[in-house]
């Protein structure tokens, strides 16, 4: 029982909400959501997105939070505290840790791109460049192994330095500051974007708010300068730098945008790092200092295939011609581990072979706030697993 007594918790509910939202808010909110929205009907897509956010995303989120709060630990130890005696649900805890590590094997590289571009705009590297020259900088960055590894390592080291200061003194303190700054930045960028010429359950709300606001930044800005918004990295590192180089005060707005992107990605990095550290401390008996040192070294090494996959190891094309290591790692996380993990959490919380719906609902109803009604039980037990299984299968075929 001694490790449980020493386990640090969040200092405030606001800190928990902002850190959790920081983990959810990331690169996909900016380089995927706005483009997919434009491709699939605009407001109609957002409407259906919000419906499924409530029908699928929110229930699974409550399950993860309930397991963590009731189990008082990281994934594996929380499962062990709640699972029926003799069952093996805690094995999924190892997959949770592997998923976090796999995510960080490429996410630190992409976060490094954001930091790189922030400093490029801050120091005026884009000043006076033509559209072709601005577009070429991204390719030059990808082709440089030294630059790619350098920024990836900077993000990794910085993330573990923050987490090394403890949950409240590190992740919560920095996360609250970064998320507050991120929300201010995105509001400033939205307001500025609309001044350009031309026509153009709280964690879930914040995540969706940032995604929608990203669209309000990107589309008016692109259309004002006659530039078609792309998807993925091309949107962030080719399309938008072209917009900023053609815009009055582009250096300032480019700097603020990539500062926003750095905050969005780094808030995810430190939240996932904290999860990795918690797992290492609880499962291996390490102290936080050792977990941070080992984690830094391990993730810098494990991040090399992604960072070097665009240059010296570009011959590795795991998903066919033109693919990269990042594509493969992202496929494993997004198409297999995330929906698969959601399905396991769901089955653990609603079946009699796991924690059970009644205990899960009782945990959700602990404390103040809205209560979980009993009528959702059939939906959670019989409909929601099928919906998530369909997403899992669809992502793999």
Locate the predicted segments by residue.
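Transmembrane helix-boundary motif of multi-pass solute transporters/channels
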Residues: 14-52, 224, 234
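C-terminal membrane-solvent junction of multi-pass transporters and transport-like membrane proteins
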Residues: 92, 284-296, 330-388
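Extracellular loop-to-transmembrane helix junctions
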Residues: 37-63, 147-148, 338-339
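Inter-helical loop and helix-membrane interface segments of multi-pass membrane transporters/permeases
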Residues: 4-7, 35-40, 70-95, 108-168, ...
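Select transmembrane alpha-helical segments in multipass membrane proteins
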Residues: 9-20, 45-48, 87-101, 149-155, ...
């Amino acid at each position: 029982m001694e490790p449980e007594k020493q386990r640090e918790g969040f200092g405030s509910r606001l800190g928990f909400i902002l850190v959790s939202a920081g983990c959810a808010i990331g690169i996909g909110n900016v380089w995927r959501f706005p483009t997919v929205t434009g491709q699939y009907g605009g407001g109609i897509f957002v409407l259906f997105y919000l419906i499924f956010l409530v029908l699928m995303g929110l229930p699974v989120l409550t399950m993860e939070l309930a397991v963590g709060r009731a189990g008082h630990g990281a994934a594996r130890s929380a499962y062990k505290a709640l699972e029926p005696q003799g069952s093996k649900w805690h094995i999924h805890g190892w997959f949770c840790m592997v998923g976090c590590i796999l995510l960080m094997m490429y996410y630190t590289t992409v976060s490094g791109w954001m930091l790189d571009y922030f400093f490029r705009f801050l120091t005026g590297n884009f000043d006076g460049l033509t559209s072709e020259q601005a577009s070429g900088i991204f390719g030059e960055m990808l082709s440089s192994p030294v630059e790619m590894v350098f920024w990836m390592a900077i993000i990794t080291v910085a993330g573990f330095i923050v987490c090394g200061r403890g949950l409240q003194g590190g992740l919560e303190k920095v996360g609250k500051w970064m998320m507050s700054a991120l929300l201010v930045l995105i509001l400033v960028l939205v307001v500025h974007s609309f001044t350009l010429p031309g026509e153009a359950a709280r964690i879930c709300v914040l995540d969706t708010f940032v995604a929608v606001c990203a669209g309000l930044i990107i589309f008016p800005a692109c259309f004002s300068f006659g530039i078609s918004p792309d998807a993925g990295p091309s949107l962030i590192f080719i399309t938008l730098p072209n917009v900023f180089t053609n815009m009055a005060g582009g250096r300032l707005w480019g700097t603020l945008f990539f500062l926003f992107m750095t905050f969005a990605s780094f808030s995810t990095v430190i939240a996932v790092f904290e999860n990795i550290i918690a797992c290492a401390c609880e499962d291996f008996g390490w102290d936080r200092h050792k977990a941070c040192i080992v984690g830094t070294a391990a993730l810098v090494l494990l991040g090399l295939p992604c960072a070097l996959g665009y240059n010296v190891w570009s011959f590795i094309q795991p998903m066919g011609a033109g693919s990269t290591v990042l594509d493969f790692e992202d496929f494993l996380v997004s198409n297999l581990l995330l929906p698969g993990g959601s399905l396991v959490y769901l089955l653990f919380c609603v079946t009699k072979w796991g924690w059970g719906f009644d205990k899960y609902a009782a945990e959700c109803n602990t404390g103040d706030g809205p209560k979980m009604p009993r009528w959702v039980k059939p939906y959670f037990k019989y409909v929601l697993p099928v919906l998530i299984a369909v997403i899992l299968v669809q992502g793999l075929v």
